[in-house]
Regions:
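A flexible loop/linker signature enriched in serine peptidases of the S9 family
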Residues: 39-42, 59-68, 84-88, 104-132, ...
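Hydrophobic beta-strand positions that form the internal "hydrophobic ladder"
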Residues: 55-56, 101, 165, 209, ...
Length: 346
């Protein structure tokens, strides 16, 4: 019996090892012990709780018509939907203490899923004007709005000190970054350049902000941007990574890759930025995005993942030991995006 038990354990370990090995792509020296946490559907933007024990993410799965918000343990267990199942949701985050969560939703405008954007004008992102930011208990109950202004309010994240939320809004006619207290008060505009600024995160000390920006310069580019925004659309073909102080001062362009670079996040020491980009793709028209890292001064660009499809939305755990990201690797079918977690190796 002991011998059979040994054989069973050996085979089980071999299967787990084979699964882990199948998730690793040659050249990914910073990632170890990669584990797949979701299996099937579209799962992305997974972010750690402040204690590093849970993840909150958006998912279109099962019979859902569009994304809803879920939480789970960092081993993939105990998956629970915490949004109300109405409208479309995006960009969720835990508040400090883990008892509250925030996310953006369109449900107060319409309870049905909003239509997908019109791709006849090329690849575009929809800027749904019904998006507002809500706070709820971590079990999804007691939903309350944090924003109520006309137009798009979304892409909210929370400072590590737990005091501030940064988000993107078109309340003043353009897509700019704003900060506010976690109760929705003391709203402050941080960016003022025409174009899109969004996807922002605070540095570990809460003193800096990293974000993606796309700023048209020629008259033709500005006209096209404004025309599309009037239709609640943007073209996400070129984003650069930027940083600024938490009060909006000292804006600095970090990347100059002329590519779609987004989802930036500071390393635990605050000296580098990990982000997603199609800069390394041989054909940037295809969905080949990888994780990359760069120093905050724009030097030392390093490729982190080498998967030939999509790797994106990276976030370090609060202790800096793990990295969570979304990827098309090991997809059961075309279009599946899943959440993965890995040990981070310097």
């Amino acid at each position: 019996m002991k011998y059979l038990s040994f054989i069973f354990i050996f085979v089980l370990c071999a299967v787990v090892s084979a699964q882990n090995n199948s998730l690793v792509v040659e050249g990914e020296k910073h990632l170890k012990n990669i584990r797949q946490l979701t299996f099937g559907g579209e799962n992305a933007e997974a972010y750690f709780s402040f204690d590093g024990k849970k993840l909150i993410f958006q998912s279109k799965r099962d019979q859902l018509g569009c994304d809803q918000i879920f939480t789970m343990n960092i081993d993939g267990s105990n998956v629970k939907m915490v949004s109300n199942g109405e409208g479309r949701t995006t960009c969720s985050y835990f508040l400090k203490g883990g008892k509250k969560v925030i996310y953006a939703s369109t449900f107060m405008g319409k309870k049905e899923c909003p239509p997908n954007p019109d791709f006849s004008q090329g690849y575009v992102w929809a800027i749904y004007p019904d998006y507002d930011i809500y706070v709820a208990d971590s079990n999804g109950k007691n939903i309350k709005p944090l924003t109520t202004t006309k137009g798009y309010d979304a892409e909210a994240t929370v400072s590590p000190d737990g005091k501030k939320i940064i988000f993107t809004s078109e309340r003043d006619g353009d897509l700019e970054l704003y900060s506010m207290d976690t109760n929705g008060k003391n709203v402050r505009r941080l960016t003022n350049e025409i174009g899109y600024d969004g996807g922002a995160f605070f540095s570990p000390d809460s003193k800096q902000i990293v974000y993606r920006g796309s700023h048209p310069t020629t008259n033709a580019e500005i006209k096209r941007y404004k025309d599309l925004l009037a239709q609640h659309l943007i073209v996400p073909t070129t984003f650069e990574v930027w940083t600024m102080n938490a009060d909006g001062s000292n804006k600095r362009q970090v990347t100059k890759l002329n590519a779609a670079s987004f989802a930036p996040f500071f390393t635990p020491d605050g000296k580098r930025i990990i982000f997603c980009t199609n800069y390394f793709a041989t054909d940037q028209r295809k969905r080949n995005f990888d994780l990359a890292m760069i120093n905050v001064d724009g030097t030392g660009l390093e490729r982190i993942t080498f998967n030939e499809t999509f790797d994106g939305f990276p976030m370090f755990s609060p202790d800096g030991k793990k990295l969570v990201f979304a990827s098309n690797r090991n997809a059961a079918k075309t279009g599946d995006t899943n959440v993965f977690i890995a040990d981070w190796v310097e």
